[in-house]
């Protein structure tokens, strides 16, 4: 999927740099953005997009004092019922670094409520999550990645489809 999007964007004149760190950007008198990347290359562009990813925002929550375990990214580690290393503390959403999507966090919260307040243990299902990326071309996925499906199920069939808008047919 990434390769298809990369190819489509490249065909539209978008240059994509991977494994490069942005050292700085400034707007020149000519109105262009002048950027320097970690390999020393200087770039002139009308626009610069920097995709840096996201990290859980847990730094000032007092997790260490509470004895709540975190991983190397400082995400709160949880079991299948969103329980942390402290049996009376639960965590859901982006701070757990499971799936960083609002509908998933809401689902995790609903499972937490069912588990804790209704005494009906329910674990969130992260296997059938639909996603959409609003690029051109648009990207949508549902279910496990191929790698995760092979790991979980062994031999799998993979189906891919590319669609054109009806107006283009």
Question: How does the language model describe each region?
Answer:
Residues 1-34, 38-39, 98-106, 114-148:
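Rossmann-like dinucleotide-binding cores of NAD(P)H-dependent redox enzymes
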Residues 14, 68, 154:
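Short phosphate-binding/catalytic loops that engage adenosine nucleotides
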Residues 15-17, 90, 157-159:
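General small-molecule cofactor/ligand-binding pocket signal
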Residues 19, 73, 159-161:
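Conserved beta-strand termini and adjacent loop/short-helix elements that scaffold enzyme active sites
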Residues 22, 28, 82, 95, ...:
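Short, solvent-exposed coil/turn elements at secondary-structure transition points
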Residues 42-120:
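FAD-site-proximal beta/loop scaffold in flavoenzymes
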Residues 49-54, 94-95, 130-138, 162-165:
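Glycine-rich beta-alpha junction loops
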């Amino acid at each position: 999927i990434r390769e298809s999007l990369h190819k489509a964007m490249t065909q539209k004149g978008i240059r994509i740099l991977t494994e490069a760190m942005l050292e700085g950007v400034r707007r020149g008198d000519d109105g262009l953005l002048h950027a320097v990347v970690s390999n020393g290359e200087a770039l002139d562009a009308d626009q610069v997009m920097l995709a840096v990813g996201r990290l859980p925002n847990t730094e000032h929550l007092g997790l260490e004092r509470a004895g709540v375990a975190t991983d190397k990214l400082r995400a709160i580690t949880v079991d299948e019922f969103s329980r942390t290393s402290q049996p009376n503390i639960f965590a859901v959403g982006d701070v757990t670094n499971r799936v960083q999507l609002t509908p998933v966090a809401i689902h995790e919260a609903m499972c937490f409520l069912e588990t804790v307040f209704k005494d009906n243990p329910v674990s969130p299902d992260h296997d059938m999550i639909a996603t959409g990326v609003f690029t051109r071309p648009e990207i949508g996925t549902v279910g496990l990645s191929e790698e995760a499906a092979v790991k979980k199920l062994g031999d799998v069939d993979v189906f891919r489809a590319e669609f054109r808008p009806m107006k283009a047919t």
